[in-house]
Structures are given as structure tokens and as C-alpha cells.
Amino acid sequence: VGFKAGVKDYRLNYYTPDYQTKETDILAAFRMTPQPGVPPEEAGAAVAAESSTGTWTTVWTDGLTSLDRYKGRCYDLEAVPGEENQYIAYVAYPLDLFEEGSVTNLFTSIVGNVFGFKALRALRLEDLRIPPAYSKTFQGPPHGIQVERDKLNKYGRPLLGCTIKPKLGLSAKNYGRAVYECLRGGLDFTKDDENVNSQPFMRWRDRFLFVAEALYKSQAETGEIKGHYLNATAGTCEEMLKRAEFARELGAPIVMHDYLTGGFTANTTLAHYCRDNGLLLHIHRAMHAVIDRQKNHGMHFRVLAKALRLSGGDHIHAGTVVGKLEGERQVTLGFVDLLRDDYIEKDRSRGIYFTQDWVSLPGVLPVASGGIHVWHXPALTEIFGDDSVLQFGGGTLGHPWGNAPGAVANRVALEACVQARNEGRDLAREGNEVIREATK
């Protein structure tokens, strides 16, 4: 009784412009490009329906639950200025649609099948508001910024890193030697490249051993705590944990994971292991551009960054603003703040669609990496501030005198920039002069 079969417009149930969002709702901002002839209200409602409780037709089992309680709602639409037939659709999802502590489940719903939907030419998730009621169900980063500084005993400046190159092809012994040279020269960290896992020319266990030797030797010589991001990414979760465990047994302070290729389930598993065992966790974002590079389809990196803060990681690559990889300055700074700060106000000029309150979830250090070198140090110090990791790969190893002098050059330049900034000098204007003085 009361059930009427047939296909209905989504907007009859899922477009609700008078809906008042709740504190506990997960809010999403989608950039939609509807197919010609599809009204934006229908497209927005379709997104809300297909990413929550809806399907293409009315089904009798709808009567067995309270759809009003569980459905996603498109509660606002705005045309994108300067773009033809593009709209921002705001969708509110009730909290009960999602499993607690699972980024995997969150993404399966919100960025699942709906992205292949016929009524849309393109769809991009621009931002998500994660309410405290949901974020409190996650452990988040294993340690966070303050605990990391305390573990490393390094304060008042950005941390320095370097990716060992050539990224593939070195033997474990030569790899360890390159690590030692860089750390001895003054870097805080060296890094496995994201595609170094356990290949025929260098098996993971051999690499871990020679790197541990380099760590202990450079620590003894410099009196500073040193780290190398040992990449634990593997084909199975069990193998990944085996590698992390061996790193812990060797006394290494930090391991690494490729969180998008490894997957959120594996990443969250590793983040829990790292907190339980006192390891820091460095996150690389290989594959992100497949998802975030198109301006009208996919997902913005700020969403992937928020997802990582929930899933867990102490460092994450965040572009550079100045190097070889793409990144717009204000927008990059927007998601850098979303990674580090506890409370971030809505600010559309920086691409932040919602005010985000992380409550007590620890912060993540943004890593600037990709085509940067010594002459970028003033700009990077100014843009990223102290709570960041600056990673010069070719910018260290490409030094004409070798790795250790390259590392010395980076450390000297960084300390000169930090000192000049602390003395009130204008790095944007005087940066090159500051570095020239430091080299004398």
C-alpha cells in the first residue's frame, strides 16, 4: 500500500534548499558539469542520491527504512563564475551513513559510482567538512608535529630532507653510502624514492641494514638525531608490517608509505602500528595527479590531504609552489594549513569551502619536494614557515663537489634564511643576498 513503482526525478527527494545542516553532517562541495539539457537541481540531487541511499528507480524496500533519516541532500547550488554550465553543489550526508574510523568506507560512498554517472559530463569533489563527531573516531597521525620535534630534538626551523637518486639501480651498499654522505653533511633526513620497494637490484632487508649503519655512523659524527624514510610499502599488508617491524628492530626513527597506491586500509593499519611502536610515518602521494590534476573532474588534493590526516601520517608531500611540480600558491597554503592547524576558517580565496575543526587530531608536517634547490630556500622558508620539511633531491646530490657538500650548502642556506627572518629581514626581497653572505 502506498508504494508506486516507476522512475522519478531525483530532485523530488534529494534537492532540499531549505535544509539546515547539522553539526554532525559530513558536508561536501562538488564541482558539477551537467550534460546538456540536465537542470543543475536534478544533477545536484542525482549526486546526493547516488552517493547515499538512492538508485535509478523507486524500490519497494524504500518503505522498510526511514530514507529521510539516511539520505544525502543537495542543499545549495551556485554557478561557477566565468565557467559555462559549471556549478558547485553542496551536499550534506548524515553521519550514520559511514563506518567509524574508515576512510575507505567514507570514500567508497562519497567518491564511488557517482563519478561515472551519465547525467554528468564531469564531477570533481572540491572539499569535505569532517565534523568532530566523525574525526574523533580516527586515531589520525601516529605522533604529530610537536612529538616529532621532541623525538628529534630539532626546533625553530624547517627540517631538511633529500631523496636518494638515482631512484632505481643502486646496490644496497652504495645506497647506504649516499645516505651517510647526505646526513653527515647536515641534513635531518634522507628518503627512499616512492618506487623503491624490494626490487632485484636491492632487496628491502639489505637496504634497511646498510641505511641503519649510515644512520648510526652519521649520528655519532654529528651529535644530531638522523632519520631515513624506509619505504615499507609492499604488495600485502602483512609484508608491509614485516618491513616496519624490521625498521623498528634496527632502531630507525621513521618509516614511509605510498598511501594512494598502497590504499587507505593499508595506510591506517601502518599508522596504528607506528603509534604503538614509536615510529614516525612519512607519506608519499604517488598517483595523486591521476586524481587531482583535472580542474573539472576527480578530487582536489585538499580532500586527499584531509583523508590522510584522518588515516594517519606525520609528513605528507604537498607540492612546492616554486619547483618543477604544479601548485598555486594560495590554494597550496590553504591545504598546508588544513594539514597543520587545529582550526581553519572557511576562505574561498584559498579554496577552503568549509570551516574545519580538527579538535585534538595531531597535525601533519607538509613536505616541499620536487625540483627545488638552495636558491629557493628564502621563498620556501617564507611560504611554509618552520613546521615543514624541505626536500632537495637533485638540489643536494647535484652539487658539483658531491653529496656531503650539497647537504652542507642546503643546511647553511636554510640556517641563514631562518636567522635573517628572525632578525626581521625581508626574505622575498633580500633572499639571494642573504644566501650570498652565508657562502663567504
From Swiss-Prot:
**Catalysed reaction(s)?**
2 (2R)-3-phosphoglycerate + 2 H(+) = D-ribulose 1,5-bisphosphate + CO2 + H2O; D-ribulose 1,5-bisphosphate + O2 = 2-phosphoglycolate + (2R)-3-phosphoglycerate + 2 H(+)
Sites bearing N6,N6,N6-trimethyllysine, chain numbering:
4
Post-translational modification as stated in the protein's UniProt record: The disulfide bond which can form in the large chain dimeric partners within the hexadecamer appears to be associated with oxidative stress and protein turnover.
Functional description taken from the UniProt entry: RuBisCO catalyzes two reactions: the carboxylation of D-ribulose 1,5-bisphosphate, the primary event in carbon dioxide fixation, as well as the oxidative fragmentation of the pentose substrate in the photorespiration process. Both reactions occur simultaneously and in competition at the same active site.
At which residues is there a site annotated Transition state stabilizer? 324
Entry protein name:
Ribulose bisphosphate carboxylase large chain
Cite the binding residues for substrate: 113, 163, 167, 285, 317, 369
Q: Which organism is the protein's source? A: Ptychomitrium gardneri
Q: Which UniProt keywords apply?
A: Calvin cycle, Carbon dioxide fixation, Chloroplast, Disulfide bond, Lyase, Magnesium, Metal-binding, Methylation, Monooxygenase, Oxidoreductase, Photorespiration, Photosynthesis, Plastid
Active site annotation, chain numbering: 165 (proton acceptor), 284 (proton acceptor)
Major location (coarse): plastid
Q: Which EC class is the enzyme in?
A: lyase
The record's free-text note on cofactor binding: Binds 1 Mg(2+) ion per subunit.
Q: Which residues form a coiled coil?
A: none
Which domain of life does the UniProt lineage start with?
Eukaryota
What is the additional note?
A: The basic functional RuBisCO is composed of a large chain homodimer in a 'head-to-tail' conformation. In form I RuBisCO this homodimer is arranged in a barrel-like tetramer with the small subunits forming a tetrameric 'cap' on each end of the 'barrel'.
> EC annotation?
4.1.1.39
Protein family according to the UniProt entry:
Belongs to the RuBisCO large chain family. Type I subfamily.
GO biological process, any:
photorespiration
The entry's localization annotation reads: Plastid, Chloroplast
Gene3D superfamilies given for it?
Answer: Ribulose bisphosphate carboxylase, large subunit, C-terminal domain, RuBisCO large subunit, N-terminal domain
A Gene Ontology cellular component where this protein is annotated is: chloroplast
